[in-house]
Design a protein with these regions (language model features):
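Residue-level detector of intrinsically disordered terminal segments
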Residues: 5, 13-14
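Conserved alpha/beta enzyme-core scaffold
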Residues: 15-303
Length: 303
């Protein structure tokens, strides 16, 4: 296999890494491997290597050879990950959460095993060894340094845990995300019980972790350069019902402020995704009686 030496953009951390194609990356993934993927929802998920793994699975199946992997993700993903691998019948096991119609059809037809565990428990369960070892971690990055510092893109998920546990790490270096995204993340792994302490986050601006994930650079078997946007969520347009819900919530919060039950400077919020959440946040943003406020979020996405 030809090894290409390239410099990452115009970074001051000029480094020589083994840059490979998506197809070459797929050669590091074997039948029965447990593979962990970065990201949380489609944000931060690998975009091109999963498709190459799917093509490899199809080719192996046509030869009469088995090829399926165990899949571990931070949450649901996009069609380029769950969809591609499901349609290729390349999944033997999937956890913790999914929302892809093709994967759902595969699971409901008993084509793969599925563990619908709460996604907040997955990283700890992996560290405990409950779900077996992680053979390969495939992660999307905005930047990576020669000493093994990986800067995630717009989602993290279980990236720190799978990178620490995996034997091999494949990086998709997505040039669509600027390397200046470094500093946006606050990556922190709590100690496992019985040694766990409180997580000392008291305001959205508190920082307790790192702006990158540090790995053993010897485990990075290759870097695949990409220039791919995140897959967007497909929600139907807001209708009268969802807008009415949004207005009701905004009016309720304004009433609580005026009654003194909420402080005038308001309080931090955390929102889910979907039409109702979009309507609520939209109506809050348009309401002049609601001041600017802080928001907790684990991912940035168009949803």
């Amino acid at each position: 296999r030809r090894q290409r030496q390239m410099c990452i953009r115009d970074s001051n951390n000029i480094m020589a890494l083994k840059f490979i194609t998506a197809e070459e990356a797929a050669s590091f993934v074997h039948h029965d491997d447990n593979v962990g993927f970065s990201g949380f929802t489609p944000a931060g998920c690998p975009k091109v290597v999963p498709g190459a793994i799917a093509k490899k699975a199809i080719a192996e199946h046509e030869k009469g050879n088995p090829f399926q992997i165990g899949m571990f993700t931070g949450a649901s993903t996009g069609d380029k990950l769950d969809g591609e691998l499901a349609r290729a019948n390349a999944i033997k096991f999937r956890t913790p959460y999914q929302s892809n119609k093709d994967l759902r059809a595969l699971l409901n037809s008993h084509g793969a095993q599925y563990f619908d565990m709460h996604l907040s428990e997955l990283a700890q369960s992996l560290r405990y060894g409950f779900l077996g070892k992680i053979d390969v971690a495939i992660v999307e990055a905005a930047d990576v340094t020669e000493d093994g510092e990986i800067v995630p893109t717009s989602g993290v998920g279980i990236l720190p845990t799978i990178c620490r546990m995996a034997d091999r790490i494949i990086i998709e270096l997505n040039c669509r995300h600027p390397k200046e995204i470094r500093g946006m993340h606050d990556i922190y792994e709590p100690a496992d019980p019985p040694y766990r302490r409180e997580i000392p986050i008291y305001t959205p601006s508190d920082r307790i972790g790192s702006d990158c994930v540090k790995v053993d650079p010897a485990k990075i078997v290759g870097v695949v350069k990409t220039d791919e946007p995140n897959e967007g969520g497909k929600f139907s347009p807001l209708d009268d019902v969802t807008m009415a819900i949004g207005q009701n919530v905004a009016n309720f919060l304004v009433g609580e402020i005026k009654a003194g039950r909420l402080p005038k400077e308001f309080v931090p919020l955390q929102s889910g995704v979907g039409n109702v959440a979009n309507a609520v946040l939209g109506c809050m943003g348009e309401n002049k009686d609601i001041p600017a406020f802080n928001v907790y979020t684990e991912v940035i996405q168009d949803a």
